[in-house]
Amino acid sequence: MGIKYGNLNVDEKYSKILEPNLYFDSILVPGVTYTDKYQTGPAGGIYVHKLDTTAVTVGTPGRDFTDEASSDTLIPILLNNNYMKSKKIYGVQAAAVDFDLANEQLSTATQEIKESRQQSALGCLVNEGTKSNGDAITANAVDAVLDEAAKIKKGKANVVLCSPDFYALVLKENGKDFTPAKNDEVAATGAIGDLYGFTWIRAAGLGEAEAKYYDSTGTLKTVALHKAATTSVDGSAVDFILYNSETLSIIDNLESFRIVDSENFTGSKAQAELNTGMKVTTPALARVRTHTIAKTGA
């Protein structure tokens, strides 16, 4: 479905700038690391699907069908995470801003929004996924991921978001083993590759202390990602998140994307505003591997 575009504050001349800058060099790519599928429900509400399945029992030919009710569940999602950026363009009125300058300023604004949106999504995955704490991983990184994959009973994980430290260990131990079609990109960027049916992605945001997002109830969540230990309290760190991309729903609504005259200084402003809803619809399909950092005191 992609991004929902409003029309009140969106200049169509510039709207094509948004998606390349929002998705380029991003860990959030629709259809790859999350799903953006949704449907509109009563009173204009936005709903995402959680599809549950049941096994088929073997029988003999010639038997009758046994009907069962659909187990498809619609889950409401609120577009309650707001990201906005306004960049000043001095000395030029909005009508006189050439396209290249508008492109530069709106692109920068979008990329800054992208970073915050990515961090929120990591917080959503860590907070709403299934936790799995263990010892610090210093060797056999791929084995640790495969161990978590075995715990996902139904459905198949296809994405591994790795902390910088964990991804470095993966590359040291298994860099030569990545699928050849993607191996050139791994060698060039050190950021993404395919191995054992998973897309492995370096998520730099997992090295940050925390992430914030508003959950589907409208509650602001502050999620610890890498909490340093103190002399009296243990710390913790996320090693990786293993999940099925269909279980992370992210819906975007472009609220504002425009060049407008400034009322405060001589010039104009490049403004971008995005409202986003995010939810892990099936927590069992998202495994969050963490380890404890021992306190430094005696």
Language-model segments: which ranges?
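N-terminal "assembly arms/tails" that initiate or stabilize quaternary assembly
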Residues: 1-75, 277, 295
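Extended oligomerization regions of viral-like shell subunits
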Residues: 42, 150-252
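A residue-level signal for beta-strand positions that form part of recognition/binding surfaces
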Residues: 45, 159, 239, 267-269, ...
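Structured loops at beta-to-helix junctions and adjacent beta-edge loops in soluble globular domains
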Residues: 49-51, 163-165, 203, 273-275
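Short helix/loop capping segments that flank catalytic or ligand/cofactor-binding pockets
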Residues: 56-59, 169-172, 281
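Short acidic, glycine/tyrosine-flanked loop/strand segments centered on an H-E-D-like triad
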Residues: 71-95
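Alpha-helical scaffold segments that mediate packing/assembly in large oligomeric complexes
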Residues: 89-156, 164-166, 289-298
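Extended, compositionally biased alpha-helical segments that mediate assembly or anchoring
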Residues: 246, 250-298
